[in-house]
Amino acid sequence: MKADEVRGLSADQLKDKLADLKKEQFNLRFQKATGQLEKSSRINEVRKDIARVKTIARQKAAEAKA
């Protein structure tokens, strides 16, 4: 997911996206623990996507406050 895609989302959509990513991260960690994970790089991708969503949500909140 690109940062431009995330910037186009509303605050509610960002919250939903964050929840989806956290669920995916949980499932990936579970698969890794049980030895079923095929693409281990996906864990890092999801972690960075979560950081992007949180960063942009914080920026939007700061802009709305200012």
Swiss-Prot record:
Which GO terms of type biological process are on file? translation
Q: According to its record, what are the GO cellular component terms?
A: cytosolic large ribosomal subunit
Q: Which UniProt keywords apply?
A: Ribonucleoprotein, Ribosomal protein
Signal peptide, first to last residue: none
A molecular function annotated in GO for this UniProt entry is: structural constituent of ribosome
Q: Which domain of life is it from?
A: Bacteria
UniProt key word Ribonucleoprotein = yes
Give the family from UniProt: Belongs to the universal ribosomal protein uL29 family.
Q: What is this protein called?
A: Large ribosomal subunit protein uL29
What is the source species?
Agrobacterium fabrum (strain C58 / ATCC 33970)
Instruction: Name the encoding gene, please.
Output: rpmC
